[in-house]
Amino acid sequence: MKRYVFMLSDGTGITAETLGNSLITQFENIQFEKITIPYIDSTHRAESVVLRINQCFSEQGTKPLVFMTLVDPEIRQAIKKAHACVFDLFSIFIGPLENELEEKSSYTVGRTHGVANVKSYSHRIEAIDFALSHDDGIKTRGYDKADIILIGVSRCGKTPSCLYMALQYGILAANYPFTEEDLVGFRLPEVLRPYKQKLFGLTIDAQRLQQIRSERRPNSKYASAEQCRLEVTEVEAMYQRENIPYINSTKYSIEEISTKVLAIAGLQRKI
């Protein structure tokens, strides 16, 4: 069975996508065709979206699902005229909040992902810049400013996790990959010892590591099953020997890796 799913927003669409995806992933036997439409900022644009939704209804014979985070009441009402099952994620929560807080909402578009808070936005940019300039062990001199330093073998998820922590949490995250030289005896590199309290390890199943590396450098020693097993075994032994906290990233998304790392490390959101 296939169902169309529309994620509608007057902003970036990130919130509608996040909430919508969280709900539909609970239905494993249904194939969802997802369509995100951001920046619906007028009733005219809303009406064109309704035409598109209705077209899907006519073609499929089943109502599309619509998850929307639209602030303007007129635009919301326009969307609700569609032949669809509409989930108004804004009005579901804003009414009860107004009652509890005894204050009316400002109904301002773009509060979540906009630049309303200049200080928060500036810190996010600083964190992203830090993650990029301290990626892959490129620059270790700034490690004293890092909130956390991810370590691990090559291709276990360090770089995307650091960027996600920077973008979503404003965390200053660096990462250091273990090289061929580090593999000899697999001792903690001296450059990392002064920052041991900031270190957090990632590991990965050897079979999965081989798959990832083979896509990058097929038929190489780097991607061989033996090399991957050796590196994973040695790095996990080193984590345990050095008392460095670590998680296995094999079955987790980047979002899950990042939140687990922050929770275990006891780091709080900065933005």
From Swiss-Prot:
Its EC number is 2.7.11.33, 2.7.4.28. It comes from the Bacteria. The keyword Glycosyltransferase does not apply. The keyword Transferase applies. It catalyses: [pyruvate, water dikinase] + ADP = [pyruvate, water dikinase]-phosphate + AMP + H(+); [pyruvate, water dikinase]-phosphate + phosphate + H(+) = [pyruvate, water dikinase] + diphosphate. InterPro entries: Kinase-pyrophosphorylase, PSRP. Pfam families: Kinase-PPPase. Bifunctional serine/threonine kinase and phosphorylase involved in the regulation of the phosphoenolpyruvate synthase (PEPS) by catalyzing its phosphorylation/dephosphorylation. This is Putative phosphoenolpyruvate synthase regulatory protein. It comes from Legionella pneumophila subsp. pneumophila (strain Philadelphia 1 / ATCC 33152 / DSM 7513).
